[in-house]
């Protein structure tokens, strides 16, 4: 039975970043002794809200109320000391330190200026026992499994007497046994009267654990379900879908040529089952899936960033042996990676160097001297044609916006003889104007006969740009939709794991 007074309330929370409104007027309540799930598409605002709750971000508008008091945290340490803990996918622990040291990091017990190891291990042992674990608190963390690391994170929260514990996609790296153990612990925490926030795309987990579900859409509050007997998979999907696809993406029907790219039972690290698909010359195929679907992993394998473990890639009906990126480039297949800053650009080099670095080898003079004339002309051509906003070709690319960095990467591949382009989250972190310019480049490439395979977690973008949508779910293909027939409800239903009897 729901209590009359909420323990945690969000009141009109808004968050704006430069050029991006991440959250708008978020208001809802959470109660002690309940698991409250947060759901929504990628980018709906769930993680941003958790970062506000935990002191990572300050809200632009609104307030967080805990146990009747308006709270504001300067950082995550202040939030943790006030009883608010977030358990992220990427666990924030120190592998070289012991379990006990990680649990009490920042508040190690001292005696005469020296860490009191006996007391430290005793107190940590109590927290470990509380969670039903059988681990020596003096064990270095690096020797434990990911599931055990997660238990240490929870023990760390309990050591601060956390009354609010939020889990952000906590099962993404866990085995089935570890998931069962996590659920056991969460249910115990609920019995103790704590507020549990739970973020997951996995429907079966949501239904197995939740007492209430709040749905977000485009940074806005949609609805809170409190009667779990009256909510099902379709009702949640319907709440998460609420926007028609307009003509803002500029898609138009086009004709295609012969098959240009084919994957025949391809497997790569992170791809659970063999993937087979084909893309024709001039066709744009979108890969859609939720967190952990395997889209990026598939593209990295195709490009030689990781090793394909089974199957074959064909370009123009010819088998391609891809063991490293240079093999893919030589075959005419290019990749714009998801993390453009870490894997796409060379930050401390100029725009000119970033555009020319791949094709440079073909234009050296005498086999060893850089052809400065060609490089200047090529860089200037792509800066103009792609409307890259930069003071000049010699500007360090790290000083450009994300959209202009992405256009420079596209310019790099336009300097090559391209047959296939793989685009992984091509517009992530890019403003609206630059997005439209990227879409126009994609359409232009298709018009030139390039086969385009692009992955995006932005469902409206996939539906708005792609001629055909391939939906991935947990490392396998869940279905395929044509542009003219696809809608958000269909795609999201395919992308989400169905409720099964596996989780009780």
UniProtKB/Swiss-Prot annotation:
GO cellular component term of the entry, any: plasma membrane
GO molecular function: ABC-type L-arabinose transporter activity; ATP binding; ATP hydrolysis activity
Similarity-based family: Belongs to the ABC transporter superfamily. Arabinose importer (TC 3.A.1.2.2) family.
Leading EC class: translocase
Keyword Metal-binding among UniProt keywords: no
Catalysis: reaction(s): L-arabinose(out) + ATP + H2O = L-arabinose(in) + ADP + phosphate + H(+)
Subcellular location: Cell inner membrane
Membrane disposition: Peripheral membrane protein
Residues passing through the membrane, by range: none
Binding-site list for ATP: 40-47
Pfam families reported in the protein's UniProt record: ABC_tran
NCBIfam families to which the protein is assigned, alphabetical: PRK11288.1 (NF008442)
UniProt domain ABC transporter: residue ranges: 8-243, 256-499
EC number: 7.5.2.12
Principal localisation: membrane
Name this protein carries in UniProt: Arabinose import ATP-binding protein AraG
Subunit description: The complex is composed of two ATP-binding proteins (AraG), two transmembrane proteins (AraH) and a solute-binding protein (AraF).
Role of this protein: Part of the ABC transporter complex AraFGH involved in arabinose import. Responsible for energy coupling to the transport system.
């Amino acid at each position: 039975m729901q209590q009359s007074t909420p323990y945690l309330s969000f009141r009109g929370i808004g968050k704006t970043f430069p050029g991006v409104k991440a959250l708008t007027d978020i208001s809802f309540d959470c109660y002690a002794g309940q698991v409250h799930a947060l759901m929504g598409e990628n980018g709906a605002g769930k993680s941003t809200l958790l970062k506000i709750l935990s002191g990572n971000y300050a809200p632009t508008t609104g307030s967080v109320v805990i146990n009747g008091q308006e709270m504001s945290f300067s950082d995550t340490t202040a939030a943790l000391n006030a009883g608010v803990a977030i358990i992220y996918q990427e666990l924030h622990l120190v592998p070289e330190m012991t379990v006990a040291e990680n649990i009490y990091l920042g508040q190690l017990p001292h005696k005469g200026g020296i860490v009191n190891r006996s007391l430290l291990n005793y107190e940590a042992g109590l927290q470990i026992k509380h969670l039903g674990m059988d681990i020596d608190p003096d064990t270095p963390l690096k020797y434990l499994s990911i599931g055990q690391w997660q238990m240490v994170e929870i023990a760390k929260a309990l050591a601060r007497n956390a009354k609010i514990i939020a889990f952000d996609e906590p099962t993404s790296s866990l085995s089935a046994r570890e998931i069962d153990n996590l659920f056991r612990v969460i249910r115990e925490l609920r019995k103790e009267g704590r507020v549990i926030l739970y973020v997951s795309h996995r429907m079966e987990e949501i239904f197995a654990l939740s007492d209430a579900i709040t749905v977000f859409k485009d940074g806005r509050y949609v609805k809170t379900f409190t009667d779990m007997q009256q909510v099902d998979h379709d009702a949640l999907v319907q709440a998460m879908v609420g926007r028609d696809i307009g003509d803002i993406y500029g898609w138009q029907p086009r004709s295609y040529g012969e098959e240009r790219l084919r994957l025949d039972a391809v497997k790569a690290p992170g791809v659970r089952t063999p993937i087979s698909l084909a893309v024709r010359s001039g066709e744009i195929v979108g890969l859609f899936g939720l967190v952990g679907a395997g889209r990026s992993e598939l593209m990295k394998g195709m490009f030689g960033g990781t090793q394909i473990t089974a199957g074959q890639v064909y370009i123009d009906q010819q088998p391609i042996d891809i063991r490293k990126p240079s093999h893919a480039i030589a075959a005419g297949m290019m990749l714009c990676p998801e993390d453009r800053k870490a894997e796409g650009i060379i930050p401390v080099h100029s725009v000119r160097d970033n555009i020319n670095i791949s094709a440079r080898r073909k234009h050296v003079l005498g086999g060893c001297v850089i052809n400065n004339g060609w490089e200047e002309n090529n860089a200037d051509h792509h800066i103009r044609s792609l409307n890259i906003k930069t003071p000049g070709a010699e500007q360090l690319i790290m000083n450009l916006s994300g959209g202009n960095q992405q256009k420079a990467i596209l310019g790099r591949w336009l300097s090559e003889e391209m047959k296939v382009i793989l685009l992984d989250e091509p517009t992530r972190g890019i403003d609206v104007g630059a997005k439209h310019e990227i879409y126009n480049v994609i359409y232009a490439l298709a018009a030139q006969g390039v086969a385009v395979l692009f992955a995006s977690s932005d469902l409206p973008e996939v539906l708005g740009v792609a001629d055909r949508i391939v939906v991935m779910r947990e490392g396998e293909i869940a279905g395929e939709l044509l542009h003219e027939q696809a809608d958000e409800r269909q795609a999201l239903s395919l992308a989400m794991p169905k409720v099964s009897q596996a989780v009780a």
